[in-house]
């Protein structure tokens, strides 16, 4: 009985840790910057594969590329103009994701800190 209960609890915790589908909002702050940039991210999950879109608001969204989830780690990329955005995030609770963002263009590279909350 104890073994069965332990397995059920582990499966439930594993399923919860992997559930990132939905709308997320928050900001990213570029290193050395003095303000935060808003973000709205819509994640669609199929197993460990992520698709969806991200951008500064609901009207300006860019498709997510190379999205995946491994445990509580969430990674994806997107392109906006000459900029390539590479997100490396981690679940910080059921309704919170935090991590880092690398922004690259031909002549520039920046890093940012990302903080997102699930929209209800």
Residues of each region from the PLM?
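Sec-dependent N-terminal signal peptides
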Residues: 4-14
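Central antiparallel beta-sheet cores of small beta-barrel/beta-sandwich binding domains
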Residues: 18-120
């Amino acid at each position: 009985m104890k073994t069965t209960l332990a397995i059920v609890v582990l499966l439930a915790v594993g399923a919860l840790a992997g559930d990132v589908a939905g709308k997320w909002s928050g900001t990213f702050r570029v290193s050395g910057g003095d303000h935060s940039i808003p973000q709205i991210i819509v994640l669609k999950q199929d197993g460990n594969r992520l698709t969806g879109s991200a951008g500064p608001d609901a009207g300006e969204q860019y498709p997510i590329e190379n999205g995946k989830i491994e445990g509580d780690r969430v990674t994806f990329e997107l392109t906006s103009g000459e900029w390539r955005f590479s997100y490396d995030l981690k679940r910080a609770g059921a309704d919170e994701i935090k991590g880092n963002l690398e922004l690259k263009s031909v002549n520039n590279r920046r890093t940012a800190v990302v903080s997102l909350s699930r929209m209800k």
